[in-house]
Amino acid sequence: MKASMYLALAGLVLLFVVGYASESEEKEFPRELLSKIFAVDDFKGEERGCKGFSDSCTPGKNECCPNYACSSKHKWCKVYLGK
């Protein structure tokens, strides 16, 4: 009986410590998220010489990036599986 009470108390203390640690990490999360969003926006401004996944393309022209192929049915770049 005593051992189970100590075990339950230790579990509650552990739960409190883990909750406190995760809460302190969550305070930094919005700042990190915003910095990643703005970093992605800067990257979008650069133009590529090829078209990526689901970009529209013209079949027969080699417009898609490596490992992608222009689908003649849908007319967008898809992953080329080699079939």
From Swiss-Prot:
UniProt-listed Pfam families: Toxin_12 (PF07740)
Q: Which UniProt keywords apply?
A: Amidation, Disulfide bond, Ion channel impairing toxin, Knottin, Neurotoxin, Presynaptic neurotoxin, Secreted, Signal, Toxin, Voltage-gated sodium channel impairing toxin
Q: Which InterPro entries match?
A: Huwentoxin-1, Huwentoxin_CS1
Q: Which cysteines are joined by disulfide bonds?
A: C50-C65, C57-C70, C64-C77
Q: Name one GO molecular function term.
A: ion channel inhibitor activity
Q: Where in the cell is it found?
A: Secreted
Cellular component per GO? extracellular region; host cell presynaptic membrane
What tissues harbor this protein? Expressed by the venom gland.
Signal sequence region: 1-21
Specify the propeptide location in this chain: 22-48
Residues that bear Leucine amide: L81
- Please report which protein family the annotation says this sequence is part of: Belongs to the neurotoxin 10 (Hwtx-1) family. 15 (Hntx-3) subfamily.
Q: How does it assemble?
A: Monomer.
> What job does this protein perform?
Lethal neurotoxin. Selectively blocks tetrodotoxin-sensitive voltage-gated sodium channels (Nav). Does not affect tetrodotoxin-resistant voltage-gated sodium channels or calcium channels.
How are the domains described in the entry? The presence of a 'disulfide through disulfide knot' structurally defines this protein as a knottin.
The protein's name in its UniProt record: Mu-theraphotoxin-Hhn2n
Q: Tell me the organism.
A: Cyriopagopus hainanus
